């Protein structure tokens, strides 16, 4: 896991989210992926168990490097196989701040987890308690685990 400190890379990632996914914090339709996706509603807050289920799915489906994006906070390049602890944080002495790795549940902010090749992703909305899933294999895996994750499927769209 590493914090994305390269401002140009950070900006390119968020520019792609805004331009290609039509991300907006102001609109009813807050994210519009240009590929097939499924929308779920969270039935409850996720704990360490649900976070681990999602991480196991990402290890299987996404494989190697992914982006972990926390709206207006640090963003990361990570590998799900690192098994980063639930609600992980550490003190970054170089930047003199505490760094928080986002949980898969969007606990207070938008949390996005996207494969580095942009083929699969989890996009969480904090106030609407929604999860948008992209990528056929990830969509199927989340669908299969929906009961354990306490997710209600709202729609599938293209």
For each predicted feature, which ranges?
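Structured alpha/beta or helical-core interaction and ligand-binding surfaces enriched in interleaved
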Residues: 1-158
């Amino acid at each position: 896991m590493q914090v994305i400190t390269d401002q140009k890379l950070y900006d390119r990632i968020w520019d792609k989210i805004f331009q290609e996914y039509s991300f907006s914090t102001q609109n009813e339709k807050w994210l519009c992926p240009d590929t097939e996706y499924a929308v779920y509603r969270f039935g409850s807050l996720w704990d360490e168990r649900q976070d681990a289920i999602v991480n196991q799915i990402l290890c299987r489906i996404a494989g190697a490097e992914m982006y972990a994006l926390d709206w207006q906070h640090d963003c990361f390049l990570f590998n799900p196989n690192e098994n980063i602890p639930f609600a992980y944080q550490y003190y970054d002495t170089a930047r003199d701040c505490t760094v928080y790795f986002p949980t898969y549940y969007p606990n207070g902010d938008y949390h996005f987890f996207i494969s580095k090749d942009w083929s699969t992703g989890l996009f969480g909305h904090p106030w609407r308690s929604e999860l948008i899933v992209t990528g056929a294999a990830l969509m199927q895996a989340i669908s299969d685990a929906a009961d354990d994750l306490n997710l209600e499927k709202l729609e599938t769209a293209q």
